UniProtKB/Swiss-Prot annotation:
One of its GO terms (cellular component) is phosphopyruvate hydratase complex. The keyword Lyase applies. It comes from Brucella melitensis biotype 2 (strain ATCC 23457). The active site is at 204 (proton donor), 336 (proton acceptor). Catalyzes the reversible conversion of 2-phosphoglycerate (2-PG) into phosphoenolpyruvate (PEP). It is essential for the degradation of carbohydrates via glycolysis. This is Enolase. Mg(2+) binds at residues 241, 284, 311. Binds a second Mg(2+) ion via substrate during catalysis. (2R)-2-phosphoglycerate binds at residues 162, 336, 365-366, 387. Pathway: Carbohydrate degradation; glycolysis; pyruvate from D-glyceraldehyde 3-phosphate: step 4/5. Belongs to the enolase family.
Length: 425
């Protein structure tokens, strides 16, 4: 009854107007699953590889080759398999690809099928996706990390850090957390506008004002939190995504916007000072992806009082995460399904983190779609934290809206993670 009888891949557009892969999976009993694959702007060197067409069509970014793989090689390999055998299906696709980075079939082709299979199996079982994947204990609604000021690769401004985020740690529900975020977002918009700044939004729905440095961005956010009637650090904490790999050159961190250069120790001390001066509770990619010594120094410096999240460092890869755990580097992993390229490997990364006492943060990409799968996965894994952009653009709000629905469905079983999500608070 849950055998796979049809798989259809197609080329659609993501939130940046670039092509991406969407996959439909149909089971013998008529159950159906659909998944669309996200794509990043600042990508780690160790990520699984997307299959793109090259050439002039869509300026080389077309995904017709990946769609052809879905409709051909992948369908031939898993047609007739039981959709409830997720691990076996994912392993079959990994083996079929045969490379270390999914570069043959393409992580975008494999992931689209992997997620669509899970959705079809969930429908066949009569369960919502979060319950099908997570079981009866899936009940924790994550604290959102809301990216309300953009810089770096996500914006055309002098700010070197990529994201400035607010975390409604003092809210009592996801519904209330979204309200907190929305009120601060709109207050910030007015304050930026009054100060003469542009209030257009970037890839992830945050503002991209022409500010001189990180402190200026943090000051605007702090003022907006207070103006909206909240207490910084108590109701709403702050977070950074430095995306430091993007400005790591020849062993140093080159801040072109500030016209400053910091060596790894100076970079770590700078982040420590920011975390001391502001209620910053989480810093993502504070050091570059291959600057393991810098990461170790930063972790030893502030890892006991600040969540240090590895994104480009770990790329949702359990093997790299285990290296980090062994070396005592970072204390959290960012989880992006397309970095590793299958649902099973994504879940394995979260489990590996939790077993080692590391936290895990479910995350979107800057190129998103209306697909809200990561909202379900955040609840399924009880990871307690999610990054899915600002409070604007429907590709971002789709995930918040899905979390609100899940909370409503769970009713009294639902628990908003709040401060407990960040073990150091």
């Amino acid at each position: 009854m849950t055998a796979i009888i049809d798989i259809v891949g197609r080329e659609i557009l993501d939130s940046r107007g670039n092509p991406t892969v969407e996959v439909d999976v149909v089971l013998e009993d008529g159950s159906f699953g659909r998944a669309a694959v996200p794509s990043g702007a600042s990508t780690g060197a160790h990520e699984a590889v997307e299959l793109r067409d090259g050439g002039s069509r869509y300026l080389g970014k077309g995904v017709e080759k990946a769609v052809e793989v879905v409709n051909g090689k992948i369908f031939d390999a898993i047609a007739g398999m039981d959709a409830e055998s997720q691990l076996l299906i994912d392993q079959t696709l990994i083996d079929l690809d045969g490379s270390a980075n999914k570069g043959n079939l393409g992580a975008n082709a494999i992931l689209g099928v992997s997620l669509a299979v899970a959705k079809a199996a969930a429908q066949a079982s009569g369960l919502p996706l979060y319950r099908y994947v997570g079981g009866t204990n899936a009940h924790v609604l994550p604290v959102p990390m809301m990216n309300i000021i953009n810089g770096g690769a996500h914006a055309d401004n002098p700010i070197d850090f990529q994201e400035f985020m607010i975390l409604p740690v003092g809210a009592t529900s996801i519904r209330e957390a979204v309200r907190y975020g929305s009120e601060v977002f709109h207050t910030l918009k007015k304050r930026l506008k009054d100060a003469g700044h542009n209030t257009n939004v970037g890839d992830e729905g945050g503002f991209a004002p022409n500010l001189k440095n990180a402190q200026a961005a943090l000051d605007f956010i702090m003022e907006s939190i207070e103006k909206a009637g909240f207490k910084p650090g108590e109701d709403i904490a702050l977070g950074l995504d430095c995306a430091a790999t993007e400005f790591f050159k020849d062993g140093n961190y080159v801040y072109e916007g500030e016209r400053k250069t910091r060596d790894p120790k100076a970079q770590a001390k700078y982040l420590a000072k920011l975390a001391s001066d502001y209620p910053i509770v989480t810093i993502e990619d504070g050091m570059a992806e291959d600057d393991w010594e810098g990461w170790k120094y930063l972790t030893d410096l502030i890892g006991n009082k600040c969540q240090l999240v590895g994104d480009d460092l770990f790329v949702t890869n359990s093997a790299r995460l285990r290296d980090g755990i062994r070396l005592g580097v970072a204390n959290s992993i960012l989880v992006k399904v397309n970095q590793i390229g299958s649902l099973s490997e994504t879940l394995d990364a979260v489990e590996t983190a939790h077993k080692a006492g590391y936290t895990a943060v479910m995350s979107h990409r800057s190129g998103e779609t209306e697909d809200s799968t990561i909202a379900d996965l955040a609840v399924a894994t009880n990871c307690g934290q999610i990054k899915t952009g600002s409070l604007a653009r429907s590709d971002r709000t789709a995930k918040y809206n899905q979390l609100i629905r899940i909370e409503e469905e769970l009713d009294k079983q639902a628990r908003y993670a709040g401060r407990s999500a960040l073990k150091l608070l």
